[in-house]
């Protein structure tokens, strides 16, 4: 089951970590979009997670990612690591048995993100800022003409308005996970663990907050969610930043997913109705929807774009733009 190209390195890792060269039991773990191969293994009657970064994985900063993971593990946010080798692309960590999420999951996530964002030692992404990546992807989406103008021209115009006023201040960047979706959150019955730190780097705090909010925060719980994160009721400016980032990410994820699907040759039906936002995310949490399939990616793209389209036509969008713009200009 372990790829032949990794078998020697895995045997060496097992020997260094546990003094053995064989695994008692091994089972593949699936569900994410990462190119890494992940397994649950048993060594000396204890379960561990084995993660293998495969050749051809997207270029990044493996050493920086592992340093971030080590920092998170030492802080008790990521599971304990038993072995890590960036050159071989091998990680062995504690395997956390998942329990059902608690009723107050939104508050728990917010408090966990506050701990993540207080960490030190994370680096900026080597390929440029997150905002630059967003702009590049949205531009590629626009150039690809994957949807008719009457569905996306307004989105592009309002996205541009948003990005003109949204702060890009490096001094505000914090240690970020950048992929806080259910597949990367494991609740053990007492505490929440974040796994898969492949995308970890310094970023705007509202990225993590917005990603997790898609899954766990209903509109009427926004104030409680942000208060749990900040430790005090959020200011109107903080609410506005959070709200605008959510809209920017709706456009970004819609663009990313449709461009990815188009490059894979997946048909895109511009007239297909978008699934309900909350229902689709509930099905993602339960595992009913598998985002590794091209069809699900297209559906999820339409979910995000429909959400953005609804919000850019609301008074709150205009108010948030004005508030953030006025704060940026003193």
Show where each model-derived region lies.
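ATP-binding pocket architecture of kinase catalytic cores
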Residues: 28-154
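Active-site acidic catalytic loop and adjacent metal/ATP-binding pocket
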Residues: 30-45, 49-50, 163-209
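Glycine-rich, phosphate-binding/catalytic loops in enzymes
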Residues: 66-67, 193, 210-213, 272
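Alpha-helical transmembrane segments of integral membrane proteins
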Residues: 71, 240-247
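A general structural signal marking secondary-structure boundaries and capping sites
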Residues: 76, 116-121, 166, 216, ...
């Amino acid at each position: 089951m372990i790829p032949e190209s990794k078998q020697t390195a895995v045997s060496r890792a097992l020997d260094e970590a546990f003094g053995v060269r064989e695994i008692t039991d091994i089972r593949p773990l699936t569900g994410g979009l990462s190119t890494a191969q992940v397994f649950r293994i048993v060594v000396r009657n204890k379960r561990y997670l084995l993660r293998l970064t495969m050749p051809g994985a997207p270029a990044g900063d493996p050493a920086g990612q592992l340093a971030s993971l080590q920092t998170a593990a030492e802080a008790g946010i990521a599971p304990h690591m038993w072995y890590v080798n960036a050159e071989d692309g091998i990680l062995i960590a504690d395997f956390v048995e998942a329990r059902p999420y608690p009723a107050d999951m939104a508050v728990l996530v917010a408090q966990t993100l506050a701990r993540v964002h207080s960490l030190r030692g994370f680096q900026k992404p080597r390929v440029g800022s997150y905002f630059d990546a967003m702009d590049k992807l949205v531009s590629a989406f626009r150039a690809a003409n994957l949807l008719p103008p009457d569905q996306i021209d307004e989105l592009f115009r309002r996205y541009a308005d948003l990005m003109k006023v949204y702060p890009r201040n490096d001094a505000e960047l914090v240690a970020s996970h950048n992929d806080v979706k259910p597949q990367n959150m494991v609740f053990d019955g007492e505490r929440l663990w974040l796994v898969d730190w492949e995308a970890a780097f310094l970023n705007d705090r509202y990225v993590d907050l917005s990603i997790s909010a898609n899954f766990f925060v209903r509109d009427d719980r926004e104030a409680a969610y942000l208060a749990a994160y900040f430790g005090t009721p959020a200011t109107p400016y903080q609410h506005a930043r959070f709200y605008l980032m959510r809209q920017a990410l709706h456009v970004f994820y819609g663009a990313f997913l449709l461009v990815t699907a188009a490059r894979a040759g997946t048909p895109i039906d511009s007239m297909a109705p978008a699934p309900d936002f909350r229902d689709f995310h509930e099905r993602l949490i339960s595992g009913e929807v598998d985002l590794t399939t091209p069809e699900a990616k297209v559906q999820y793209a339409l979910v995000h774009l429909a959400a953005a389209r609804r919000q850019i036509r609301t008074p709150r969008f205009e108010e948030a733009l004005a508030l953030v713009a006025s704060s940026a200009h003193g």
